[in-house]
UniProtKB/Swiss-Prot annotation:
It is found in: Membrane. Keywords: Glycoprotein, Membrane, Transmembrane, Transmembrane helix. This is Serine-rich and transmembrane domain-containing 2. The keyword Glycoprotein applies. It is a single-pass membrane protein. Glycans are attached at N11. Disulfide bonds: none annotated. PANTHER family: SERINE-RICH AND TRANSMEMBRANE DOMAIN-CONTAINING 2, SERINE-RICH AND TRANSMEMBRANE DOMAIN-CONTAINING PROTEIN 1. Residues 69-90 are annotated as: Disordered. Coiled coil: none annotated. The gene is SERTM2. Its main location: membrane. The chain crosses the membrane at residues 38-58.
Length: 90
């Protein structure tokens, strides 16, 4: 038994390597499990990015045109930066 084990002590190309259980043909349920995982990960990241995009767009919309309770008021409203530039300096 030990003689057969030490027979190929040099180059190992003569040995026959049989496939293990991990390299055998997958079943139909295991074949698509990685695909489902990657598709689910992609869709969840896409949903998070879309939520962030819409949140940023809504914030930008409120910065550009803020919501006023008195919409009939015709007096133009300015931000602090615009008001400081309109103040005359002596």
């Amino acid at each position: 038994m030990m003689e057969a084990h030490f027979k190929y002590h040099g180059n190992l190309t003569g040995r026959a390597h049989f496939p293990t259980l991990a390299t055998e043909v997958d079943t139909s349920s295991d074949k698509y499990s990685n695909l489902y995982m990657y598709v689910g990960l992609f869709l969840s990241l896409l949903a998070i990015l879309l939520i962030l995009l819409f949140t940023m767009l809504l914030r930008l919309k409120h910065v550009i045109s803020p919501i006023n309770s008195d919409s009939t008021e015709s007096v133009p409203q300015f931000t602090d930066v615009e008001m400081q530039s309109r103040i005359p300096t002596p």
